[in-house]
UniProtKB/Swiss-Prot annotation:
Its main location: nucleus. GO terms for molecular function: DNA binding. The lineage of its organism: Eukaryota, Viridiplantae, Streptophyta, Embryophyta, Tracheophyta. Residues 1-51 bind DNA. This is Putative B3 domain-containing protein Os08g0333500. It is found in: Nucleus. Keywords: DNA-binding, Nucleus, Transcription, Transcription regulation. InterPro entries: B3_DNA-bd (IPR003340), DNA-bd_pseudobarrel_sf (IPR015300). One of its GO terms (cellular component) is nucleus. Residues 92-121 are annotated as: Disordered. Residues 95-107 have a biased composition (Basic and acidic residues). Residues 108-121 have a biased composition (Polar residues).
Length: 421
């Protein structure tokens, strides 16, 4: 259900609908709810390679007199800098050895700037950036950000996070979805007061907005990252990096691709799939697949939710270095195990990676047990909140509802929410 929020003095109040929400959901004292941010936002991204500075955009020629520019740079120009409504983001590949204690700041508030000898306004690193938890920034990146900050609007900032291996080309699109807060409010009051992280506050206007609350009390998939033991309204400092590819099906929301009560609603264009569906204990998903050097994660095969509709594309594969998308069937090559898997890798050797407990089952049809064949099409069916395979189904009813799809074809399947027991 929806409630109305009111922003007052840096805090939010659920001014309407809170009491009804508590009554309808049976929310008990001490249980948590999910605050689902529906406000559209886009965050621009700058990609750095493993050397952290070899792909820095070129400093505009008007500032050539600045002698502190990085030594190595390419001819990539800076354009489409964000406005005050769209914060910026920098993806920096860092290591624990380069930790800097002064590389973090928690505020979006403009800090008074200083002036250099030429009278131009400059902004410090802390005035330009705020870092995700456990994120370190190297001196050359700090220096570079301080330089390009002179060309940004004053309300623009970089949100600095870390990624695993570089699995995207420079010209690919990367989206950032911010995980919304876990809240615990008093169920006996008529209103619920809470605060949001400072970088989210910038996306809200000083008006009453309609938002969505979901309860996590009845989640079928317990998820340790909900951190139910932490204090109420404490920020969960996590981000979701999403790789996007060109798609004939632009969709509004990437939804329900992960565990219950951890839905992602990020406005975007083009089909995509977020990396946070990988198991939280996986430190480097690309290395877990096959070294991470010759695989583009979901570069050739793409999938994503379009509201309550699933859109899936299967691309043909022609070469040992081309990625493919497959997943183990409950009856093919997995000993009948009743767990979903999503797999990405290159042919031969079964170099696939999967996850348990997600909402999607997807795999390529295969004649041999335990192997996905190159170029085979994908056939899926969404039934009862799951995606089932196009072949080898024991139920004639399910098998009759889908047909073969040519490799590269797009199709949409209506999603049915699972019935509550």
């Amino acid at each position: 259900m929806t409630v109305e929020l009111e922003k007052i003095a840096g805090s939010f109040f659920i001014s309407k609908g809170w009491k009804t929400f508590v009554h309808r959901t049976g929310l008990l004292s001490g249980q948590y709810i999910r605050f689902q941010v529906l406000t559209p936002s886009k965050i621009n991204v700058l990609l750095f390679d493993k050397k952290k500075d070899s792909k820095l955009p070129m400093i505009p020629s008007s500032k050539k007199q600045i002698k502190t520019a990085p030594k190595r740079s390419t001819g990539i120009t800076i354009n489409d800098m964000p406005t005050s409504k769209h914060a910026s983001m920098l993806i920096s590949h860092t290591s624990n050895k380069e930790t800097s204690s002064d590389s973090r700041t928690e505020s979006m508030t403009d800090i008074p700037s200083s002036s250099d000898n030429s009278g131009e306004t400059t902004r410090s690193f802390d005035d330009l950036c705020f870092c995700a938890r456990n994120t370190a920034v190297t001196p050359d990146i700090k220096n570079y950000i301080s330089i390009i900050g002179q060309f940004l609007q004053r309300s623009s900032k970089f949100y600095i996070v870390t990624m695993n291996n570089t699995f995207m080309k420079q010209d690919r699109l990367c989206k950032l979805s911010l995980l919304t807060n876990m809240l615990m409010c008093d169920v006996l009051t008529d209103t619920c007061r809470f605060t949001l992280p400072s970088f989210l506050m910038a996306f809200f206007q000083n008006t009453v907005q309609t938002q969505t609350l979901t309860t996590c009390a009845d989640s079928p998939y317990p998820y340790e990252h909900l951190r139910k033991t932490e204090p109420a309204c404490r920020e969960i400092d996590e981000v979701t990096l999403t790789m996007c590819a060109h798609s004939p099906y632009p969709y509004e929301y990437l939804r329900k691709t992960e565990l219950a009560c951890r839905e992602i609603d990020e406005v975007t264009t083009g089909a995509s799939l977020s990396t946070n569906i990988l198991p939280p204990y996986t430190s480097s998903p690309l290395e877990a697949i096959s070294g991470g050097e010759d695989i583009w994660w979901l570069a050739a095969s793409r999938m994503g939710w379009r509201g309550d509709v699933a859109a899936v594309q299967a691309d043909s594969v022609d070469g040992n270095n081309s990625p493919f998308l497959c997943a183990r069937s409950p009856t093919i090559g997995n000993g009948g195990a009743d767990q979903p898997y999503l797999m990405v890798g290159k042919p031969h050797g079964w170099p696939c990676w999967g996850w348990d407990g997600a909402e999607m089952w997807l795999w390529c049809q295969s004649k041999n047990s335990g192997h996905c064949h190159i170029g085979w099409p994908v056939g899926v069916l969404v039934k009862g909140g799951r995606i089932y395979p196009g072949g080898g189904l024991p139920s004639k009813e399910l098998a009759g509802m889908i047909g073969p799809y040519a490799s590269g074809d797009w199709f949409e399947l209506k999603r049915e929410l699972p019935a509550k027991a």
